[in-house]
Structures are given as structure tokens and as C-alpha cells.
């Protein structure tokens, strides 16, 4: 089984769809492959765990469920900006 690490390009709010997700795939001999995915039509389930952030679950078209943990969420008083619009 191959190991895949996940990280968000930027934090998202509850109820928002992410614009994109970086997938970091570790291969043989410590070779790292970065994969860029834009899950615009993915189903999402969000659960908040107290004091630790949020866990996001995406169901991609390949029918593979991907789960990762967001350690840092945007503070409520911080202004939201989108660099892609």
C-alpha cells in the first residue's frame, strides 16, 4: 500500500467547497510526486473535532474516499480572500 499525504492550498470554511487539493504521493526511493486535484463536484462531509480542527471527507469520481485533517482553520475575524477570482 502506498502512502499519500494531503494538504489544502488554503483553509476553507464550513459549508464551502474547496477550490483545490494538493496530494503528495511518496513513491519508491523517496521520490515525491505532487498531484493537483480540483474537486469541484465532490461530495463533502465535515465534522469538527473539539480543539483540533476539522476533518474533511471527499468522494472523488474514482470512488475512493479521501480523508485528511486541517490543523489550522481561518480565525473568524480574519478577512476571506480568494486569489483565484
UniProtKB/Swiss-Prot annotation:
Superkingdom per UniProt: Eukaryota
GO cellular component, as recorded: chloroplast
Annotated compartments: Plastid, Chloroplast
Location (main, coarse): plastid
Keyword terms, alphabetized: Chloroplast, Plastid
Chloroplast listed as a keyword: yes
Similarity field: Belongs to the ycf76 family.
Protein name: Uncharacterized protein ycf76
